[in-house]
Amino acid sequence: MQPYQLSDLKPGSLLGGFRILEVYPEGRGGMARVVRARPLKGEDQQAALKISRTGGNQDYFFAAIQKEVEILQKLDHRGVVRLKPVSEGKNPFKERAVEITDSPWFFGMEVLRGGSLEAYLRGLGALSLAEAAAVCHQVGTTLEYIHREGFAHNDVKPDNILFRRELKVGERLEPVLIDFGVAAKLVRPQLDGSVVYMAPERLQESREPSAPELLASGDPSKADVWSMGILLYRLLVGREPFLGLTDRSVTSAILRAIPPSMMKRRQDLPRELDQFVIEGCLAKEPKLRVSMREFNSVIDRYSGDWRVKRAPKNRRRLPWRR
């Protein structure tokens, strides 16, 4: 059979021991494509397959996806996406896609049925304090575990937080972190990850803001704290503190601008929480930020019950240092 191009992936295509059922939309600047597939034989359990990009910089993309598998094999937490076997080889969790030109690497994951936090937030605007804190505490405890295991996620954002089960009104939400593609400490040929949620130290290490190497200096876990501060801000206010028309303008704001107080847009928030986010999470200097453990300790004080409000239309000595 003649190999096909990665861009020609479609339902019905064969990939390893799987038949593709659905091709998910390609993410902006992504290093891989993701499809939903069914095994050709054996158990009838579906898997999400992540396939490395080909073409320019493909050696980097191939290495990154293999590193992602290695990281996920070392993590065992309900808040981290679970691997699924794709081959009977030495490492059953990764395989070459010989059906595709250049035989890119791919690996399998559980299918997460509830969509992304980004999709859930559309149309909701801001969440209540108890709900926002519950979201961030659940994701934060997952990140605290990841940090203990010696890794930093480096791309925490609503698009990379999915829900394990299909969303039903009144049920509790179970967020799961996906996409560990930039968790590996590799030299980056381009700006991987979402700039809006990116910490300043990850932007400063390049002479050109549009092409940073993205190697976090000092304690890389502090970049995740920054992203959680941005996420909490978004959940409470309905928008991120640093926005712009281009990645370059967002980069400039992250590096130079002081984030506006959340209380300017929402007066019912506790002043100490506003100070915690602005000074404890979004400090420009990583060493001035709290640890993920401190973040979780503070956020847990505000956390409440978090249940689905609506099913999505498209299925597709600072005061906190105690």
Q: What are these model-predicted stretches?
A:
Residues 56-74:
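AlphaC helix of the eukaryotic protein kinase fold
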Residues 141-151:
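Protein kinase catalytic-loop region centered on the HRD/HxD motif
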Residues 116-127:
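AlphaC helix of the protein kinase catalytic domain
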Residues 237-241:
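Structural helix C-cap motif within protein kinase domains
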Residues 135-136:
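Activation segment signature within eukaryotic-like protein kinase domains
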